[in-house]
Amino acid sequence: MMWKWVTLLLFVLVCGDNPVNAAAHNPFVCCHQKNETAHTPPKKAWSLVNAILHSPSQCNHTNVALAYFNTTKGYKQVSCVNGFGLMSFCLALFDRLLTINVRVADQKFYDELLGYKRGFAAQFSKATTDSSGFKNNLELDLITTRHGRMASKTHVAGLTRSSASSQL
C-alpha cells in the first residue's frame, strides 16, 4: 500500500507541477465559509487534484487547507480540509522517501512545510485547532479525549522546555 503513495508522490515531483502548494499568497476561502454550507468531497484520496495550504498567519493560526477534487461528473469540486492532516501526510511521505534514500526533488516545498509546521506548533492551542467554525469537510480529530472533546494540554515528545519554541 505504501508503494502506491510513494509512486504518486514521485509522479507528482517528476512532472514538475506540484499539486500541493505552500505559499502565503493563496486565497482565504476556507477562513470565511461556515461549515453548514460544506459539501462532502469525494471519498477517494486519488481524486485530489490540487491543494493549497495556508500559512500560520492566515485564518488566525487555525490550520485549514483548500482542496480541489475531480468528480465523476467531470468537474472539479472545491472543499476545505483539515490542514494538519494534509500537511502531516505530505511531510510523512517526504520523510519516508528520505529514509529510503530518495532525494527530495522539491526541497523548497519541503522546507516551507516544515516552517509551517513549526509556526502552527508555536500557536498550538485548543482554540487554534478547532476548525469547526470554518467550512471544513474532512474532519480528522487528531487530538481528542476519550469522549470526543479536544484535549486542553498537549506534549511534543523529545523537546526540552528551552527548545520547545524553536523545534518540533
UniProtKB/Swiss-Prot annotation:
Pfam families from the UniProt entry: Phage_glycop_gL
Region (Interaction with gH) residue spans: 25-138
The keyword Nuclease appears for this protein: no
Subcellular location, record wording: Virion membrane; Host cell membrane; Host Golgi apparatus, Host trans-Golgi network
UniProt KW keywords: Fusion of virus membrane with host cell membrane, Fusion of virus membrane with host membrane, Glycoprotein, Host cell membrane, Host Golgi apparatus, Host membrane, Membrane, Signal, Viral envelope protein, Viral penetration into host cytoplasm, Virion, Virus entry into host cell
InterPro entries found in the cross-reference section: Herpes_gL_rhadinovirus, Herpes_gL_rhadinovirus_sf, HSV_GL_alphagamma
Function: The heterodimer glycoprotein H-glycoprotein L is required for the fusion of viral and plasma membranes leading to virus entry into the host cell. Acts as a functional inhibitor of gH and maintains gH in an inhibited form. Upon binding to host integrins, gL dissociates from gH leading to activation of the viral fusion glycoproteins gB and gH.
Protein name per Swiss-Prot or TrEMBL: Envelope glycoprotein L
Organism annotation: Alcelaphine herpesvirus 1 (strain C500) (AlHV-1)
Gene name as annotated: gL
